């Protein structure tokens, strides 16, 4: 595929805001986390003084690995859980949470959707809560093994329906994101897309809802990557036209709609690609546009 060329004119790009899974992590490197070319590009961007911003649906554990892998702590910030939490200079400068009672209500409301294999809660706790009661015992065991075989992409978790409920009810727990997962492979992705419209119809007035591969993500209403990124850029005194945003999935659409220098991965769903200006075969192809 031939890449389209755009000109940024006289605009100086001072920040790169990138998604992780499917973007910076494409192609996957199960043991090294990031490909050599992508890692070097990010490192060089940071060393040149650009603000590198990891904008992800993940919590803080894996972004922390990225910072360690790149070996540069300066000029790297994190927008986690699709905009629910912003970390700058090692401190939380902004967050939006789902009230605990509201999250518990959603937990029970989702029980009727038998297509859900696991239900995950991303919180301020080190380990995410995972209710896998939608799986039979054999598949639950296979899923547990699968989670532990993710290599560099592994995130700490604790299994159990009752444990998840107790975690939600704990007033010390801050809930950033709730994520139903629909299974492995193409079937899981197709199921998530089919259920997505039902979720938006039933829960869309109370939640920000996005699809991401075989999962659907719920954040509190009004929470999104673009809103959080703007908060961070304001703190960094960077204009919105001085940032390049890169992503590949539904939760990146707010970035593409709010920032003019937008880049999307070529393997993204067509409806996502239509929202961005430039398509990239690989993340490090960004070097063709940003010096």
Named regions from a protein language model:
Residues 20-27:
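Generic N-terminal amphipathic, Lys/Arg-enriched alpha-helix
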Residues 1-18, 37, 47, 238:
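Non-catalytic pre-domain segments flanking phosphatase-related domains
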Residues 28-31, 39:
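Polybasic, low-complexity association/targeting segments
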Residues 123-244:
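Conserved acidic, metal-coordinating active-site core of Asp-based
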Residues 54, 120-121, 180, 245, ...:
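Structural beta-sheet core signal
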Residues 12-15, 24, 35, 215-291:
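Mg2+-dependent phosphoryl-transfer enzymes with acidic/Ser/Thr/Gly-rich catalytic loops
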Residues 36-144:
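Active-site phosphate-binding/coordination module
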Residues 13, 49, 75, 173-175, ...:
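A general structural motif
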